[in-house]
Amino acid sequence: MALHDENVVWHSHPVTVAAREQLHGHRGVVLWFTGLSGSGKSTVAGALEEALHHRGVSTYLLDGDNVRHGLCRDLGFSDADRQENIRRVGEVASLMADAGLIVLTAFISPHRAERQLVKERVGHDRFIEIYVNTPLAICEQRDPKGLYKKARAGELRNFTGIDAIYEAPDSPQVHLNGEQLVTNLVSQLLDLLRRRDIIRS
């Protein structure tokens, strides 16, 4: 922390998280999608957001590539930069959940420790870790961005799943089979949100 941080204080505001959630008609939570590149994180998260939007739910999707065009454009792919990338996204997601939104995030987020830090920042009761479990061979077959091909050719270093480790969640709240149809996965997630009384529709 900076030396002047003792002069920076937290300001409480009259509008509470509960009041915002009441206005939206649902709880504010963070749905944290994690998995290998090509596992289907962004696809499933996007389909779920669309389904929630059609049900009148206030949402926002934070996508790994998109945030690197602005919020994290100064970061590379070193371990330190990846950690900072996830820290920033976690802070933004927490603020959005405070605003009463259902926040969907689609990030490889390969390390358990980083995901745990976000969980602690957001709050255990507002953080749902969703592991999109797709075999590496399937992810390579999909390879929508051609990244695996580059990594195998040695043109892309420190690529998760090839020459950088991915630490699968030990006990995710949701474990999805990434080889299933997206519509099936979305149905599973909607059922979960209803069971947990996060949404009502």
Swiss-Prot record:
EC nos: 2.7.1.25
Top-level taxon in the UniProt lineage: Bacteria
Recorded metabolic or biological pathway in which this protein acts: Sulfur metabolism; hydrogen sulfide biosynthesis; sulfite from sulfate: step 2/3
GO biological process: hydrogen sulfide biosynthetic process; sulfate assimilation
Record bears the keyword Kinase: yes
Keyword hit for Transmembrane: no
Molecular function via GO: adenylylsulfate kinase activity; ATP binding
Reaction(s) catalysed (UniProt annotation): adenosine 5'-phosphosulfate + ATP = 3'-phosphoadenylyl sulfate + ADP + H(+)
Active site: 109 (phosphoserine intermediate)
Residues that coordinate or bind ATP: 35-42
Keyword annotations: ATP-binding, Kinase, Nucleotide-binding, Phosphoprotein, Transferase
InterPro entries, alphabetized: APS_kinase, P-loop_NTPase
Free-text function comment from the UniProt entry: Catalyzes the synthesis of activated sulfate.
Family label: Belongs to the APS kinase family.
Protein known as: Adenylyl-sulfate kinase
Gene for this chain: cysC
